[in-house]
């Protein structure tokens, strides 16, 4: 089992954790249907960038 050599300071711990925060999903409005969807993802009805890519 790994055991640290020296104690990490609060500052170093905070610097390491600075990249751990989560961000909310970026949403866009589809041009054809006006539907909200995640950016760079196909909408629920199969459109991507105004083009039908999935037939349901």
Curated annotation (Swiss-Prot):
GO biological-process terms attached to the record: translation
Entry protein name: Large ribosomal subunit protein bL32
Transmembrane segments: none
NCBIfam families: rpmF_bact (TIGR01031)
Record region (Disordered): 1-38
Polar residues bias: start-end ranges: 21-31
Family of the protein in this entry: Belongs to the bacterial ribosomal protein bL32 family.
Pfam families: Ribosomal_L32p (PF01783)
Ranges of compositional bias, category Basic residues: 7-16
Keyword annotations: Ribonucleoprotein, Ribosomal protein
GO CC list: large ribosomal subunit
Any one GO MF annotation of this record: structural constituent of ribosome
Organism: Shewanella woodyi (strain ATCC 51908 / MS32)
Lineage: superkingdom: Bacteria
């Amino acid at each position: 089992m790994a055991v640290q050599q020296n104690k990490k300071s609060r500052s170093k711990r905070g610097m390491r954790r600075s990249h751990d925060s989560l961000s909310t999903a970026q949403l866009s409005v589809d041009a054809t249907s006006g539907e909200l969807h995640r950016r760079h993802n196909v909408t629920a009805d199969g459109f991507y960038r105004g083009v039908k890519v999935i037939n349901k």
